[in-house]
Amino acid sequence: MRLCDRDIEAWLDEGRLSITPRPPVERINGATVDVRLGNKFRTFRGHTAAFIDLSGPKDEVSAALDRVMSDEIVLPDGEAFYLHPGELALAVTYESVTLPPDLVGWLDGRSSLARLGLMVHVTAHRIDPGWSGCIVLEFYNSGKLPLALRPGMLIGALSFEPLSGPAARPYNRRQDAKYRDQQGAVASRIDKD
């Protein structure tokens, strides 16, 4: 059962759930909290690699990822990031979220953006119990026109679902937590699997 708006506010008031900066009540809807786009992005560079062997030796996978991923792009206030048709880019939420070990979160993109061809998360929409940090967005433009994305715009909504009990291995306590405390548009760390 997902938390309703009253429960989300209560969990925030009690400090059981943290969203920084705290959203105003107008952005806490029936069962979701609106989140905004941050100013950090990462793209794929022009490259000549025919493929990346994701099950290859870890050092080769790491080197291939370094060749194709850009450095982090930090946009100044007021500037737009342009996502062209058929392009994938990483970005982050403006808000940082911390979940307790007995709560899982879900990120959904906005329907208004999906109707323009923008996928806000390609596959990874679960936010694990114990997560703390900004949420990386996996943008894909499946539409016909370039889209101008501006930091601060509403980009998605979070919902929260209590677990039957606290997780024994919440994300923030796992030794293999590759994206712990991320604040930027962190590239894939599949080579750490």
From Swiss-Prot:
Catalyzes the deamination of dCTP to dUTP. Homotrimer. Keywords: Hydrolase, Nucleotide metabolism, Nucleotide-binding. It comes from Salmonella arizonae (strain ATCC BAA-731 / CDC346-86 / RSK2980). Its EC number is 3.5.4.13. It catalyses: dCTP + H2O + H(+) = dUTP + NH4(+). Residues 169-193 are annotated as: Disordered. Pathway: Pyrimidine metabolism; dUMP biosynthesis; dUMP from dCTP (dUTP route): step 1/2. This is dCTP deaminase.
